[in-house]
Regions:
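Glycine-rich, anion-gripping cofactor-binding loops and their flanking helix/strand elements
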Residues: 159-169
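Conserved strand-to-helix beginnings and helix N-cap segments that scaffold or border functional pockets
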Residues: 12-13, 135-136, 162
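Short helix-loop-beta junction
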Residues: 134-152
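Short acidic loop-to-helix transition motifs that present clustered carboxylates
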Residues: 73-76, 155-161
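Conserved thiamine diphosphate
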Residues: 1-124, 149
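Residue-level signal for short, function-critical loop segments
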Residues: 4, 38, 129-131, 155
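Hydrophobic pocket-lining "lid/loop/helix" segments that shape and contact the acyl-thioester
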Residues: 118-121, 126-128, 133-140
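Short, catalytically relevant binding-site loops at active-site mouths
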Residues: 98-99, 131-133, 156-159
Length: 169
């Protein structure tokens, strides 16, 4: 595990050529799990040189790479177990700071499937990682103004859950 700014930014050619490209029959890519922390703009005192948003874009375009961004410790634990049981390359990005618990212990996580955390009729906020809590807070504020907002945790960025997003549109 390392900072999200460094792994994709400095190692993209090794990740692409040595992890994602090799295939053996039906198996695409090697069975490597890449985990980073300090993702996004939430690195606190580590400063601007450690902030990144482009890591997601870099990893999404690599063939055979799957990208997940858990919202809380429960999601991290369950998704770590899930990806350990699925062959192929994965990129998991986590935040630096402690995040509030959003999911219950009984929540199931399926790679490629988002989770509707709150139903709503007027608008939808699809979020990932630490922004899921921000989306729930925004939905609470909108509710005070009579706006019913659906919130979706899109913890799988690649493959994205097109079905849940199309239903919400």
């Amino acid at each position: 595990s390392t900072y999200a700014i460094f792994l994709p930014g400095r190692c993209v050619d090794q990740i692409r050529n040595s992890i994602a490209y090799p295939s053996r029959g039906e198996k695409k890519g090697l069975n490597v799990k890449l985990v980073t922390s300090h993702g996004g703009l939430s690195v606190g005192p580590d400063g601007g040189s450690h902030q990144t948003i482009e890591d997601i874009a870099i990893m999404r375009v690599i063939p055979n790479m799957r990208v997940i961004i858990p919202a809380d410790a429960i999601a991290v634990s369950k998704l770590t177990k899930n990806i350990s049981q699925i062959y192929g390359p994965f990129y998991m990005r986590m935040a630096r700071s402690k995040v509030p618990t959003i999911h219950s212990d009984s929540q199931e996580f399926e790679i490629g499937k988002g989770i509707t955390l709150r139903d709503g009729n007027d608008c939808t906020i699809a979020a990932t990682g630490i922004t899921v809590k921000m989306a729930l807070d925004a939905a609470d504020k909108l509710q005070q103004d009579g706006i019913s907002c659906r919130v979706i945790d899109c913890f799988t960025i690649k493959p994205i859950d097109k079905d849940i997003l199309e239903k919400a549109a």
